[in-house]
Amino acid sequence: MGIEKKQLITNGFFSKKRERIEEVVTMLKKSGVNSLLLSVDAFHQETIPLEPVKYFAECVVKSKIPVKLSPAWLVSEEDNNPYNLKTKEVLGKFKDLHIPIGSGNIVFPSGNALKYLSEYFEDGVAYSSPYEEDIFDVRAISFSPNGDVLNGNINNNDIQDILESYRP
């Protein structure tokens, strides 16, 4: 299929067991993953322990898979809110690994963000999602944990067939 960039976006929490974390990184390397974005921020670390994620990052660095930290920023990276301050603190815990920090994502007011974080967004401002894409110009595909992708499911159909039959 000629897919040059095989990128994985992950929270890095596959196990608390170091041996399993090492196995996962080895499998990622063997599968051809050549770009990894590691989501580390205040939101992920509310429910995910940092130690196994940091060990995962150490293993990824050792494996030579190109990796960037990918934080989620509330409102903007520059906004001085408690979530962004915590995110900066979490990112600091990875400093010794010398992993570059990517642009990450901006949390915008929609869904649960609007429901639980509305106090951080200005009233009366029309926000739009920076992540909406043209359905006729697919440049990347994302798989849901259950295998859903575009108009099919990789558990039921070959990915090549799904891509060839895609009609927006």
PLM-predicted stretches and their roles:
Residues 10, 67-73, 99-112:
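A generic structural motif
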Residues 2, 68, 87-103, 124-128:
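Short, electropositive alpha-helical surface patch
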